[in-house]
Amino acid sequence: MPVKFDATTIIAISHNGENAMAGDGQVTMGEKFIMKGTARKVRRIYDGKVIVGFAGSVADAFNLEEKFEKKLSEYSGNLQRASVELAKIWRGDQQLQKLEAMLIVMDEKEMYLVSGSGEVIAPDDGILAIGSGGNFALAAAKALKKHATQVSAKEMAKTAINVAGDIDIFTNHNVIALDFKEED
């Protein structure tokens, strides 16, 4: 049975021309115990030009991240095209259909949620969230975008994960947040 990141929270935010993504560090084995508190579920790929965050089975998420990076190379860094092509092969391959993970991918201009059922979703409001604490983080991010307009996208993402961590028992406060302003 693969180890799952079901109990995780990932959020991506576009605000005032900035894009940022954040995730917590908790890995829960089933619903029984915390296996690790410092996992890195948000990372840079494609020479730092793309940020990817994942929820789901650890092995499956790494497999999909690798396939996504190959698609990025194949399509010269075109995030939308790479996302659509990954979703096509993910949905069309019986072995890949068994993978249990979701990805959020972003570059400096756009972001997408990519799932195994073939969805590639771009948000209307510049916010995407996945994982067990995703709805809590999403609500926090929406409030921040509306009422704390001076806050950076990266700070909003961190705060949203921390709010989720206050509510969701499967999300911790070991937040990794990345943006495109600096190498983290």
Curated annotation (Swiss-Prot):
In the UniProt record, does the keyword Protease occur?
yes
- From the UniProt record, list the reaction(s) this protein catalyses: ATP-dependent cleavage of peptide bonds with broad specificity
Q: Which InterPro entries match?
A: ATP-dep_Prtase_HsIV_su, Ntn_hydrolases_N, Proteasome_sua/b, Proteasome_suB-type
Q: So what EC number does this one have? A: 3.4.25.2
User: What are the annotated GO cellular component locations?
Assistant: HslUV protease complex; proteasome core complex
Q: Which UniProt keywords apply?
A: Allosteric enzyme, Cytoplasm, Hydrolase, Metal-binding, Protease, Sodium, Threonine protease
> For this UniProt entry, what is the primary localization, expressed as one broad class?
cytoplasm
Q: What class of enzyme is it?
A: hydrolase
The record's subcellular location field reads: Cytoplasm
Q: How is its activity regulated?
A: Allosterically activated by HslU binding.
The record's function comment reads:
Protease subunit of a proteasome-like degradation complex believed to be a general protein degrading machinery.
Q: Which family does it belong to?
A: Belongs to the peptidase T1B family. HslV subfamily.
PANTHER family assigned? ATP-DEPENDENT PROTEASE SUBUNIT HSLV, METALLOPROTEASE TLDD
| Subunit organization | A double ring-shaped homohexamer of HslV is capped on each side by a ring-shaped HslU homohexamer. The assembly of the HslU/HslV complex is dependent on binding of ATP.
Put simply, this protein is called ATP-dependent protease subunit HslV
Please give the organism: Pediococcus pentosaceus (strain ATCC 25745 / CCUG 21536 / LMG 10740 / 183-1w)
